[in-house]
């Protein structure tokens, strides 16, 4: 799903933001599809849950994902991921 370069100068949360945005824009993650929980994604990637939470917060702020209390995070419908990748 996602690969991280732990030796990169780019922060891990930024790598997560970019990777998830790419998956959304390529259609690998469909609109309204539920994302993995913060804890499960952190465990799978071997990173701190706070790192994943920061990435999810950035994606939500940018409109790529949305959160539902008690349910999780989901892919937003619309072109937000493509705009984010283009730097707009």
Stretches with model-predicted labels:
Residues 62-88:
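HTH-adjacent hinge/linker in prokaryotic transcriptional regulators
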Residues 1-2, 13-14, 29, 45, ...:
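Broad hydrophobic/π-residue packing in well-ordered secondary structure
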Residues 35-66:
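N-terminal helix-turn-helix
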Residues 1-34, 40, 84, 88:
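Extreme N-terminal segment that seeds HTH/winged-HTH DNA-binding domains in transcriptional regulators
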Residues 16, 43-45, 49-50, 56, ...:
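Alpha-helix boundary/interfacial micro-motifs
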